[in-house]
């Protein structure tokens, strides 16, 4: 009887009732912080804001003839079907159903159909900051990545110093400028072949004539040499030439090229500096662009080039950045990593929705019949099951579990993988990344991480 009574008392004793009692004579100087708040808060933020943003980015999905339009509204989570204990015992995933308001609008008739659509079961975080996937406890490790922004670097190439500028977005195409060994200003869009940066400026319509370019960037030797090599003299020539480099094999047209560049650099759905990126760009280049503008602007590009030219000319006050400094890095926590994966699933689902819009009978269509949740479910399952950052929780003792939840990793998608320069062989990580940097002091434990 005593045994069974103990059991009952145990199950009623929940994690929230635990009180920390100190038996020391000297009072504790500081209250112990919640050490797994990194994980918990991030996932809570994702459940609310992260999902809302992902749905907002995908709305509206339009049919090819622009008659039908699907938009996503508010979302909510149902209750998990099983408790954490049941999931552990029966090798199940601890998850809750995700439901979303979906509205289907027929623009011709003005008819609107609304439904609460089931978007699949979503793994939930336990109070301990872990996930239970098929009965095993897993942890999503936070990822250390380069912060979006603009970076300057230099390297030696056949005895000459080369200066580079990179505009790195949170999501989208990289833009790299460099003053090469022939002292010309070059640009590489989305890591494709290098081309003249003045041609790029013409194509964007920032500066079209040679005089415009000299007025914008000054009359240095670098600019003179670049203009001599630049074959395109009008905006149309420049657009066609750039399209040839970006999409070799396709017939180049001015309109196709213009929409390609617009889409790559100025479309918020495909290019996002994020607020941290906008802040870093403004700070580095002394700009005053609004924080809400998270795509590139003409000023960003011009200011980046001006700084690069001053740096290459060796002017005072212009210096290259240290990539390994923590000021140039940021942490992607669980919430952001899961949100990115959810976005991938959503974009795959969009294709299915468009196909179904064109194939189904317009009068019969309902939001439920259009939406196929398989891509989303598969994408989330893939992340928790096989991503480099979703790891089997270290359960040697309570402390190893805690340190595992607070660990940082530079690997994983969007982090470092197979680098060209000096790398430690086993994981292809550049040795410089593994070095202890003075900015780590009092921020990151060099041993546990």
Give residue spans per PLM region:
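N-terminal non-catalytic structural scaffold regions of very large proteins
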Residues: 4, 9-425, 437, 449
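Membrane-bilayer interface helices and TM-boundary transition segments
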Residues: 426-448
């Amino acid at each position: 009887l005593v045994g069974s009574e103990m059991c009952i008392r145990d199950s009623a004793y929940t994690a929230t009732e635990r009180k920390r009692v100190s038996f020391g004579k000297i009072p504790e100087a500081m209250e112990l912080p919640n050490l797994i708040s990194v994980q918990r808060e991030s996932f809570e933020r994702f459940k609310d804001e992260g999902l809302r943003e992902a749905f907002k980015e995908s709305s509206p999905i339009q049919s090819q003839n622009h008659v039908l339009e699907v938009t996503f509204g508010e979302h909510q989570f149902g209750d998990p079907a099983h408790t954490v204990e049941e999931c552990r015992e029966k090798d199940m995933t601890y998850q809750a159903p995700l439901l979303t308001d979906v509205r289907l609008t027929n623009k011709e008739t003005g008819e609107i159909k609304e439904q609460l659509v089931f978007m699949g079961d979503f793994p939930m975080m336990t109070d301990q900051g872990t996930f239970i996937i098929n009965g095993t406890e897993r942890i999503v490790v936070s990822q250390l990545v380069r912060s979006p922004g603009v970076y300057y670097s230099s390297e030696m190439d056949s005895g000459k110093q080369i200066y580079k500028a990179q505009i790195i977005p949170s999501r989208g195409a990289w833009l790299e400028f460099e003053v090469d060994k022939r002292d010309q200003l070059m640009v590489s869009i989305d890591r494709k072949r290098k081309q003249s940066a003045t041609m790029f400026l013409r194509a964007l319509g920032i500066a079209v004539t040679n005089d415009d370019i000299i007025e914008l960037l000054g009359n240095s030797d670098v600019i003179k040499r670049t203009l001599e090599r630049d074959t395109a003299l009008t905006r149309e020539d420049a657009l066609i030439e750039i399209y040839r480099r970006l999409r070799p094999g396709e017939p180049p047209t001015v309109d196709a090229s213009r929409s390609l560049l617009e889409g790559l650099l100025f479309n918020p759905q495909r290019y996002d500096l994020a607020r941290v990126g906008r802040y870093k760009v403004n700070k580095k280049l002394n700009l005053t662009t609004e924080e809400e503008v998270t795509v590139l602007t003409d000023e960003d590009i011009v200011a980046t080039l001006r700084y690069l030219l001053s740096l290459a000319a060796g002017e005072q006050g212009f210096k290259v950045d240290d990539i390994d400094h923590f000021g140039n890095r940021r942490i992607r926590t669980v919430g952001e990593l899961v949100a990115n994966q959810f976005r991938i699933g959503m974009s795959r689902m969009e294709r299915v929705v468009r196909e179904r819009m064109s194939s189904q009978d317009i009068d019969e269509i309902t939001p439920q019949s259009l939406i196929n949740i398989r891509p989303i479910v598969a994408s989330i399952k893939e992340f928790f099951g096989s991503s480099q950052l979703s790891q089997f929780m270290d359960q040697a003792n309570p402390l190893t579990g805690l340190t595992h939840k607070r660990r940082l990793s530079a690997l994983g998608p969007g982090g470092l993988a197979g680098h060209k320069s000096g790398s430690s062989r086993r994981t292809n990580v550049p040795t410089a990344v593994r070095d202890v940097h003075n900015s780590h002091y009092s921020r990151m434990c060099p041993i546990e991480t």
